[in-house]
């Protein structure tokens, strides 16, 4: 089995910074420290409301980073323009609601389908690999293939919440396995993310065919107690 890549999402370093309106802690410093400690990529979400990562963060991190940058954006003209300018290695198109605390679910691929298809084509022509953040259902995976995405990122939030709340996750695990298998059969690169902890990442790493985990909130939270370097190394060991 090939190693699962670890993408470190540093959004919530910016959340802490913005809580006081100061210039620390530095998302760039977090990105470079993650890179130094064998993260395979860095993920940032440039939201329309700029509630954590902002345009300057994106510019500076992209210019300094040596490992791939995975930029999460909504399917809008503004974000398409920014992504085309910055040319990150990966772009993950995600749903976005202004009132949500965090991304609440996968993209509705039957909404704005024509725009999505044109957006994906432009981003791919600009040498970025494009991922769609979707629920683990077979219909959406087939639609992602039809839209000519390179990758899918499976939303693991429900599965992770079942584990956190000590409830049975067997049915959801089977659902995720079927979704991941179909993605691979269709030639899509399969990533997984949202709500992942040490425990849930360890269980999901048993599924053959996941190429990458993107982990942020829990990882940044644990780093308060153990440090960012140690937390990244622990995740690396768990998902190897």
List the predicted regions and their residue ranges:
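Glycine-rich phosphate-binding active-site loops on the catalytic face of alpha/beta enzymes
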Residues: 45, 92-100, 151-163, 209-228
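Catalytic cores of alpha/beta
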Residues: 77-86, 137-147, 192, 196-210
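Histidine/lysine/aspartate-rich catalytic loop segments that bind and position anionic ligands
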Residues: 129-182, 186
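Hydrophobic faces of well-ordered beta-strands that scaffold small-molecule active sites
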Residues: 4-10, 42-44, 69-73, 91-93, ...
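C-terminal helical cap(s) of enzyme catalytic domains, especially alpha/beta-barrels
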Residues: 105, 164-169, 221-240
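Active-site mouth loops of central-metabolism enzymes
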Residues: 9-27, 68-75, 102-110, 127-136, ...
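Alpha-helix-loop-beta-strand connector modules within alpha/beta enzyme cores
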Residues: 51-77, 109-131, 168-192, 235-240
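Conserved N-terminal beta1-alpha1 strand-loop-helix module at the mouth
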Residues: 1-88, 143, 171
């Amino acid at each position: 089995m090939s190693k699962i890549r670890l993408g470190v999402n540093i959004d919530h370093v910016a959340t802490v910074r913005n809580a006081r309106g100061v210039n620390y802690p530095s998302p760039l410093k977090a990105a470079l420290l993650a890179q130094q400690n064998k993260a395979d990529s860095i993920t940032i979400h440039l939201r329309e409301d700029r509630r954590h990562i902002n345009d300057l963060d994106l510019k500076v991190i992209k210019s300094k980073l040596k490992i791939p940058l995975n930029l999460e954006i909504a399917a809008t003209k503004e974000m398409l323009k920014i992504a085309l300018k910055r040319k990150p290695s990966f772009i993950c198109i995600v749903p976005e609601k202004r009132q949500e605390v965090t991304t609440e679910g996968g993209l509705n691929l039957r909404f704005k389908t024509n725009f999505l298809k044109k957006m994906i084509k432009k981003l791919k022509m600009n040498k970025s690999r494009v991922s769609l953040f979707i629920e683990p259902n077979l219909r959406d995976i087939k639609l992602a293939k039809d839209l000519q995405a390179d990758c899918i990122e499976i939303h693991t939030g429900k599965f992770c919440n079942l584990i956190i709340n000590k409830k049975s996750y067997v049915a959801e695990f089977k659902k995720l396995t079927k979704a991941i298998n179909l993605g691979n059969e269709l030639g899509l690169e399969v990533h997984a993310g949202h709500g992942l902890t040490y425990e849930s990442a360890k269980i999901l790493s048993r599924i053959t065919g996941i190429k990458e985990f993107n982990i942020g909130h829990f990882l940044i939270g644990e780093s308060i107690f153990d440090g960012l370097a140690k937390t990244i190394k622990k995740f690396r060991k768990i998902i190897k």
